[in-house]
Design a protein with these regions (language model features):
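Positively charged n-region of N-terminal signal peptides that target proteins for export
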Residues: 1-5
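Cyclophilin-like peptidyl-prolyl cis-trans isomerases
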Residues: 6-7, 15, 19-235
Length: 235
């Protein structure tokens, strides 16, 4: 679907003056996609399949979210090709996942997606000419899955074009569930955020989400929701 059509849906609610950035590309001083580091919630009891982390639902600020006891074990085939379809309340984004170059990150994303962790989660931070951020079950930028894992930086993966799927973090080795998709090249993020995918169809959707009217903290006034993430393994 063309970007022009998507933007027409929000024409009445998106005055140009609402754009956060005035320049066509982000400045190096722009605040990067962050996942505010919060105390890990204790997970002491719950259910788990054999070899899987224990899952427990906890109440946080009136929200009931899933928390896991540990990083999921490696379940993917790093020699295979994986794709993800992020179904949103607008339209879908199709993404190629880089399993061979960021195996831990892709494995984590697939685990959470298949477990329904992202279902109903909003894009809580959107910035025109920069990126859109999601993956926090609290919808505030402070939530996660209950664990953190290491970065995976690869020299051949860079923020050199729009559509990069990468992890938000609060510093080294603080990856969890929050991720972002870029809408322009963002080279100032190289070496700071793990890249683990690339949009292959639906860049206009990411662009449209970045342009919705937002309020304090770049939070959309009208929520844009992830309905689900479908994972496919291609031989």
């Amino acid at each position: 679907m063309k970007l022009k059509f998507l933007l027409a849906i929000f024409a009445a609610a998106i005055p140009l003056a609402a754009c956060v950035l005035e320049t066509p590309s982000p400045a190096p001083s722009e605040v990067p996609p962050t996942a505010v580091s919060a105390p890990t919630l204790p997970v002491q009891s719950g259910t788990a399949a054999a070899g899987q982390p224990v899952k427990q639902f906890v109440d946080v600020g009136g929200a009931r979210i899933a928390q896991y006891s540990s990083v999921p074990p490696m379940m993917i085939d790093t020699s295979a090709q994986y794709t993800a379809v992020i179904r949103t309340s607008l339209v879908n984004m199709d993404i190629e996942l880089f399993a061979a170059m960021a195996p831990v990150t892709v494995n984590n994303f697939i685990f959470l997606a298949n477990d329904g962790f992202y279902d109903g989660v909003i894009f809580h931070r959107v910035i025109p000419s920069f990126m859109i951020q999601s993956g926090d079950p609290l919808g505030q930028g402070t939530g996660g899955p209950g664990y953190k894992f290491q970065d995976e930086f690869v020299a051949s993966l860079a923020f050199d074009q729009p559509g990069k799927l990468a992890m938000a973090n609060s510093g080294p080795a603080t990856n969890g569930s929050q991720f972002f998709v870029t809408t322009v090249p963002t080279p100032h993020l190289n070496g700071l955020h793990t890249i683990f995918g690339q949009i292959v169809q639906g860049q206009d959707v990411a662009d449209a989400i970045s342009l919705v009217q937002s309020g304090p903290g770049n939070r959309p006034v009208t929520p844009v929701i992830i309905l689900g993430i479908d994972i496919a393994k291609n031989p």
